[in-house]
Amino acid sequence: MFKRIFLLTLTNIAVIFLLTLFISLLHLDRWLNAYGIDYQTLFLFSMVVGFTGSFISLAISKWMAKMAYNIHVIQEPSNEAERWLVETVAELAKRANIRMPEVGIYESPEVNAFATGPSRSNALVAVSTGILSQMNKKQIAGVLAHEITHINNGDMVTMTLLQGVVNTFVVFLSRIIGFFVDRLFSRNEERESIGIGFYLGMFISEIVLGLLASIIVAWYSRMREFRADAGGAHLAGKEAMISALKKLKQIMEGESAFIDERSPALNAFKINGRPGGILALLATHPPLDERIKALERIPD
């Protein structure tokens, strides 16, 4: 976790340097200063706003998941199915060389599972009753291995940091655009104060930039799913992972296809997401056919 935070901090420093250089080369700093805009302070403000919400969400992610899905965390297995589930997660965590995550079950007809938590050593793997009833043990093991890989790769932290970075730029650029629009349409005597043009420009640009930011985050999420599939194949076996995805494909193409939307923020961390369709650029998961083909290309 700390390695990723360090790397993202370096990335932010590099971005700040390049942004400052870009503004200076285009002499935008003169224009910004002329209108009383301290862009360096604005950028720091944007970072605070951009990252605060992301880190709070990460810190309480396990609690949120438990509340949203009413997850039954298995402290002591009460039946054979729970015992097998806990033992399988423990074995996969051992193979991945990470601390045993909490294991839980949530009541839902969706065939899905997800991992969440603020770090590799403080995570939760939850499975639906739907997946337990519709998949065999080999397939479930593949799904669990996929989720363990998400934890091992630190995907929850990385996604949070990436979201914080794009949030920062959305906040920063939308306010710069707002200032520009306000000065463009205001009369000279009105330029000493912020007018309606600022708020209108900021609001519209936040929507547009937010959409572009979502496309970037979704693209990274799709790449992350391919890595989690490959890691799942390494931990549980390629055939188990392929079998699990083929079963998911069969279910999603049937009449019983269902995605539980009680906590949309967790959808990106599930084994399966809603198909992208026209909005494929915003899909957090690649098409199942592509994921299966990627696994089939892995050497035995």
Curated annotation (Swiss-Prot):
It holds the Pfam family Peptidase_M48. The active site is at 147. One of its GO terms (cellular component) is plasma membrane. One of its GO terms (biological process) is proteolysis. It is found in: Cell inner membrane. Its EC number is 3.4.24.-. The chain crosses the membrane at residues 5-25, 41-61, 161-181, 196-216. Binds 1 zinc ion per subunit. It is an enzyme of class 3 (hydrolase). Disulfide bonds: none annotated. Its cofactor is Zn(2+). Zn(2+) binds at residues 146, 150, 225. Keywords: Cell inner membrane, Cell membrane, Hydrolase, Membrane, Metal-binding, Metalloprotease, Protease, Transmembrane, Transmembrane helix, Zinc. It comes from the Bacteria. GO terms for molecular function: metalloendopeptidase activity; zinc ion binding. This is Protease HtpX homolog. It comes from Methylacidiphilum infernorum (isolate V4). The gene is htpX.
